[in-house]
């Protein structure tokens, strides 16, 4: 049975202990190589997985680390010392261009905590915001200020949790990052079945946002809503004031907006175009970009039926002269006026009288 915290007893890419003095070539089987190359075990592809029950692999299925290193630039040697929990395996990530990822090997219960996340401790003033800080998490003080960052970008500070990728959207997210004390943990937010990649991002289930005090949780929001009829302005101002970016102190009215904004500082771009692999920090920006590939134009003008791929294009069109209806449409039911001549004043008066008579309501005696 799996405990509430994933144990740190795992081994070299496969279940079971590595015997003392066992060479790396003796534990890398064809099945492990298949997983490394294609991202899943063979049984996921409909083939039967034949595990070697002994500690020694068959010479026909064993591959030397030197041969693998030539193909993967020494990645296998790095992974040979990686300690994995028995509940997970490492394989090619399902996210394009992200390299290796962590997949569940057995069922992982909701609420299971993994960690702590390890790495170098960096003071906030020493963080280079121009770098790719995807492998970095912030740790907060009780007053909501950043205490330090945990950076796992250097190889000698990496653990198996480093290979867990960030979720691109809420639908694929199955882990959330939580702060317990001064340590960072990943927590399963749902029951995770076998052969599913572990993907993490910030969560909403706790009364604090990544341990930041003062951010209203569910219970606090429910209490606040009871008093909104009496203090609506104060309530809205207080919520926006508490949800502030810890780096630039900009205020937000929701946690999702704050999480999206934080990607500007971390340079995290989890949204990848499936056509050109270009990366974006916002899902809405990715959707607009994909329309350039697909030719989709969902925004249509109701007057002239012109179509646009982005809402900004439609709004610009609506402000232009092309969007205005023809002026003749307003004159369709107006009587034609004669050309001006010497008796124009008299004719104009007669036309006005006729028009007035035309619009007088009929009276029934």
From Swiss-Prot:
Domain of life of the native organism: Eukaryota
Keywords (A to Z) from UniProt: Activator, DNA-binding, Metal-binding, Nucleus, Repeat, Repressor, Transcription, Transcription regulation, Zinc, Zinc-finger
Family statement drawn from the similarity comment of this UniProt entry: Belongs to the class V-like SAM-binding methyltransferase superfamily.
Function: Transcriptional regulator necessary for the development of nociceptive neurons, playing a key role in determining the nociceptive lineage from neural crest cell progenitors. Initiates neurogenesis and activates downstream pro-neuronal transcription factors, such as NEUROD1, BRN3A, and ISL1, specifically within nociceptive neurons, while repressing non-nociceptor cell fates. Essential for the proper function of nociceptors in adults, influencing both their excitability and their gene expression, thereby impacting how these neurons respond to various pain stimuli.
Known partners and oligomeric status: Interacts with EHMT2.
Protein name from the UniProt record: PR domain zinc finger protein 12
PANTHER family named in the record: PR DOMAIN ZINC FINGER PROTEIN, PR DOMAIN ZINC FINGER PROTEIN 12
Subcellular locations according to the entry: Nucleus
SUPFAM superfamilies the UniProt entry points to: beta-beta-alpha zinc fingers, SET domain
Transmembrane segments: none
Molecular function per GO: DNA binding; histone chaperone activity; histone methyltransferase binding; methyltransferase activity; zinc ion binding
């Amino acid at each position: 049975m799996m405990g509430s915290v994933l144990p740190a007893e795992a081994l070299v890419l496969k279940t079971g202990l590595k015997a003392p003095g066992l060479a790396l070539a003796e534990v890398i089987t064809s099945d492990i190589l298949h997983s490394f190359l294609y991202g899943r075990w063979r049984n996921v592809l409909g083939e039967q997985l034949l595990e070697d029950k002994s500690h020694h692999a068959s010479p026909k299925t064993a591959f030397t680390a030197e041969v693998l290193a030539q193909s993967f630039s020494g990645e296998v040697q790095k992974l040979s010392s990686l300690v994995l929990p028995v509940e997970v395996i490492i394989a090619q990530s399902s996210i394009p261009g992200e390299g290796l990822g962590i997949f569940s090997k057995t069922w992982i219960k909701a609420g299971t905590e993994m960690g702590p996340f390890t790495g170098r401790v960096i003071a906030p003033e020493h963080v280079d915001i121009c770098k790719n800080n995807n492998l970095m998490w912030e740790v907060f003080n009780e007053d909501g200020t950043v205490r330090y960052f945990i950076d796992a970008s250097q190889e000698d500070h990496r653990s198996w949790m480093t290979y867990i990728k960030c979720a691109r959207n809420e639908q694929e997210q199955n882990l959330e990052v939580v702060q317990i004390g001064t340590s960072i943990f990943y927590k399963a937010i749902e029951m995770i079945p076998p052969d599913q990649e572990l993907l993490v991002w910030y969560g909403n289930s706790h009364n604090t946002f990544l341990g930041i005090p003062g951010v209203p949780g569910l219970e606090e929001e429910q209490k606040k809503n009871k008093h909104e009829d009496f203090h609506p302005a104060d309530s809205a101002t207080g919520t926006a004031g508490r949800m502030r970016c810890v780096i630039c102190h900009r205020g937000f009215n929701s946690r999702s907006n704050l999480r999206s904004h934080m990607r500007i500082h971390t340079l995290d771009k989890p949204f990848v175009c499936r056509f050109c692999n270009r990366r974006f920090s916002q899902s809405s920006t990715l959707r607009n970009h994909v329309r350039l590939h697909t030719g989709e134009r969902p925004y249509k003008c109701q007057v002239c039926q012109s179509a646009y791929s982005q809402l900004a294009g439609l709004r610009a069109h609506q402000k232009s002269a092309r969007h205005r209806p023809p002026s003749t449409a307003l004159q369709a039911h107006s009587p034609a006026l004669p050309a001006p001549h010497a008796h124009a004043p008299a004719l104009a008066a007669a036309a006005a009288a006729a028009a007035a008579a035309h619009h007088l309501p009929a009276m029934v005696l």
